[in-house]
A protein has these predicted regions:
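A short, acidic, flexible beta-alpha connecting loop/helix-capping segment that sits on the rim
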Residues: 173-183
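H/E-rich (His + Asp/Glu) clusters that bind or coordinate divalent metals
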Residues: 147, 156-158, 163-165, 170-174
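A structural motif
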Residues: 24, 119, 167-169
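Active-site acidic/histidine proton-transfer and metal-coordination neighborhood
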Residues: 1-94, 156
Length: 184
């Protein structure tokens, strides 16, 4: 998480170094949970600092940093763009988590269209109808979803947007609750 450089600054740089050594092309992160003792303006200074340091390491190793919508600032398209625009680096891109984007109350498809040119990874997470009814617009994300295609998201549309709008091949990492759901 980028808001806490004293805790996670070295961790993200280590993750990038390891990724570069073992051939992993993308690492993902978010801003993390807000500290109680900082203001929003201070948080963005901390995020910028951490992201600049991480981008410097990532550029030298050919690793991309995927910014994920998962917390208080990145839960909207405007907030994620604000973080993305803090540091100009070819190493920084977007990891759109479709489930988190949906649960935040945003239009997943419009958001995906907007970030497609910057997309470096996609967390393929579907959300069940009951999960949607209980949490949409109330949370910034969830660690697990349901099997892709069994929830509220239109996967044919998502795949079509990625194929048509992304300038690179994109890995879809499936995030669901069980191995059986992942196999579907």
């Amino acid at each position: 998480p980028l808001c806490r450089p004293e805790v996670h600054g070295e961790y993200i740089k280590l993750a990038i170094r390891v990724a570069g050594e073992i051939g992993v092309p993308v690492i993902n992160t978010d801003e993390g949970k807000k500290a109680k003792w900082t203001t929003e303006d201070e948080d963005f200074v901390l995020i910028k600092y951490t992201l600049q340091e991480a981008a410097f390491v990532a550029e030298r190793r050919g690793v991309k940093i995927g910014l994920e919508p998962h917390s208080q600032y990145s839960k909207t398209p405007e907030g994620l763009d604000r973080i993305y625009n803090l540091v100009k680096s070819p190493a920084i891109g977007i990891n759109l988590d479709t489930g988190n984007a949906y649960l935040s109350g945003s239009d997943v498809y419009a958001w995906l269209e907007n970030v497609a040119p910057r997309l470096v990874h996609l967390h393929a997470k579907d959300i069940s109808v009951s999960h949607s009814d209980a949490e949409r617009g109330k949370v910034t994300g969830t660690p697990v979803g349901c099997a892709c295609g069994e929830g509220v998201l239109d996967w044919e549309r998502i795949v079509r947007i990625v194929k048509e709008k992304c300038p690179r091949d994109i890995v879809f990492s499936v995030e669901c609750g069980t191995p059986d759901q992942a196999a579907k």
